[in-house]
């Protein structure tokens, strides 16, 4: 994290990242514990939604965010093809069990295993030490992240091909074979908001799988070519810089997802998320229902809740990106505040 040349800098309790910045073991513990919290939240929320589900009302007009995602990938349907929630409770309970496993892993890495992988007795573990200004170290870790993303894409593509996912065009579950047409995939960069072919959606995921697996192998196998200069990021590559780039990525994805989910009914079917939304502009963009909302989310549809929350989270993630990027570049916000009074008026006036 940025210290502005102060070797004895201290951080407040709210700066959680500062406690794991140079301790890769604790960093892994935080990752595992965070995964446990996410799994617990997903499992618990799914059970709550399932318990309150009313089959006489459209799913998109109820509190059904997690149920809608499961229905979209073909989970919860009986033999007649009707969504009854069969098997959903099992998935939710599995998430609760896994949350305990992840939480236990977080505790083990936090209190039992070494706090820094560099001190580990296992040679393979020492490769995952954190050297924020070492491009060879960072590209090695990045490569493993890309491999996991690639495997996740393969799993999704194979799930659609073997089990099948919900197709709103026929209002039923069907097996979807991916269309790996690179021309189509390239063209969908510009019209993905209106994509209406599940084959093309799966083709995009298949392409990402190959791309990410190849990128992962490349980043693991390669090292810095030539001298590590300022042009290549020397003295800029840091924990704060990487945090800022991560926030930029997740913020951008959240904003794109908001625009996509607002109107696309192929990936986000009306049967599960509610009707398409209309964009409005006030202080910032927001989306409203085009029909009367439901019984949850303050009278709004699942789609309206999903889209607006995604957009505003993305917006604030991007603000976090700008904050941490400026700090990584050496901008000291404290000096700015010291020179200004209320409402930004310079103290020298």
From Swiss-Prot:
Subcellular location field: Cellular thylakoid membrane
Membrane topology: Multi-pass membrane protein
BP term (GO), one: photosynthetic electron transport chain
InterPro entries given in the database record: PS_antenna-like (IPR000932), PS_II_antenna-like_sf (IPR036001)
Induction of expression: This transcript is moderately expressed between 4.5 and 72 umol blue light/m2/s. The whole antenna complex is most highly expressed under low light; as the light levels increase antenna complex levels decrease. Thus at least in this strain the amount of antenna complex is controlled mostly at a post-transcriptional level. Transcription decreases slightly upon iron starvation.
Subunit structure comment from the entry: The antenna complex consists of divinyl chlorophylls (a and b) and divinyl chlorophyll a/b binding proteins and binds more divinyl chlorophyll b than does the antenna complex from high-light-adapted Prochlorococcus.
UniProt family annotation: Belongs to the PsbB/PsbC family. IsiA/Pcb subfamily.
Function: The antenna complex functions as a light receptor, it captures and delivers excitation energy to photosystems II and I. The Prochlorales pcb genes are not related to higher plant LHCs.
Listed name of the protein: Divinyl chlorophyll a/b light-harvesting protein PcbB
Organism: Prochlorococcus marinus (strain SARG / CCMP1375 / SS120)
Gene encoding the protein: pcbB
């Amino acid at each position: 994290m940025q210290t502005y040349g102060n070797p004895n800098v201290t951080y407040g309790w709210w700066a959680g990242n500062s406690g794991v910045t140079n301790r890769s073991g604790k960093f892994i513990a935080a990752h595992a514990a965070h995964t446990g919290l996410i799994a617990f939240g997903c499992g618990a929320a799914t059970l709550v939604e399932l318990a309150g589900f009313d089959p006489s009302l459209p799913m998109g007009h109820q509190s059904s965010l997690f149920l809608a995602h499961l229905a979209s990938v073909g989970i919860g349907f009986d033999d007649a093809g009707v969504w009854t929630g069969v098997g959903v409770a099992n998935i939710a309970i599995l998430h609760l069990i896994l949350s305990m496993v992840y939480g236990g892993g977080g505790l083990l890495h936090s209190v039992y295993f070494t706090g820094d992988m560099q001190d580990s007795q296992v040679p393979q573990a020492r490769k995952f030490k954190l050297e924020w200004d070492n491009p060879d170290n960072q590209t090695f870790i990045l490569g493993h992240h890309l491999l996991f993303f690639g495997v996740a894409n393969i799993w999704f593509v194979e799930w659609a091909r073997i089990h099948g996912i919900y197709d709103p065009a026929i209002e039923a579950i069907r097996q979807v074979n991916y269309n790996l047409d690179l021309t189509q995939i390239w063209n969908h960069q510009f019209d993905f908001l209106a994509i209406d072919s599940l084959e093309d959606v799966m083709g995009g995921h298949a392409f990402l799988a190959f791309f990410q697996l190849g990128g992962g192998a490349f980043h693991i196998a390669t090292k810095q070519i030539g001298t590590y200069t300022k042009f290549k990021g020397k003295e800029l590559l840091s924990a704060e810089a990487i945090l800022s780039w991560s926030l930029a990525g997740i913020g951008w994805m959240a904003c794109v997802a908001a625009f996509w989910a607002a109107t696309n009914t192929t990936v986000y079917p009306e049967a599960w998320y509610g009707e398409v939304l209309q964009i409005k502009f006030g202080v910032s963009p927001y989306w409203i229902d085009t029909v009367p909302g439901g019984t949850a989310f303050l009278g709004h549809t699942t789609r309206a809740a999903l889209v607006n929350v995604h957009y505003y989270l993305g917006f604030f993630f991007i603000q976090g990106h700008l904050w941490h990027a400026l700090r990584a570049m050496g901008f000291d916000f404290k000096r700015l505040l010291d020179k200004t009074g209320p409402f930004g008026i310079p103290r020298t006036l």
